[in-house]
């Protein structure tokens, strides 16, 4: 058994703990709406990027080790998965589930479908938007992805077509939902939005 610190990263600080630490909000077990939005955004970013994603067990319910960054020899209370948090943060669990279903249903997000480079959309400020694949020069891809790191709602132009949500920043599903959008879309604060063309 290799007990060196290089053997594994599972004892490092969890995403939730990192968010709490950076925000200097000490009660690691307490839910926090702002940090839950950041947690959803982080998951939305890495699950819409090319390559194979890696997430730590329990991330989908904001697993915490109460700020302890090295629990290698720590007690079971810190190293176990606290399933009561999964019940308390069911909406976050469902969000992760939806993102994973989207990634499974749309292989162009992973880059594993052999698609061309994503088409980056021209957007103002800190907004990022892209179409994961191209279908010729004049046709948009079937998906559009937007990242809004701002703490306020932002407007972004849409590629041509009629678009519906797969992810609106708080809900994610492999089947489109919500009303159709054309020309522009209002992005929720601190969110990832995924749209599918009709």
Give the residues covered by each predicted segment:
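Carbohydrate-interacting/catalytic domains
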Residues: 14, 31-198
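Single conserved hydrophobic/aromatic residue that forms the stacking wall/gate
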Residues: 1-11
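Active-site-proximal loop/helix segment associated with metal-binding centers of metalloenzymes
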Residues: 13, 17-19
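Metal- or metallocofactor-binding catalytic centers and their adjacent structured scaffolds
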Residues: 22-32
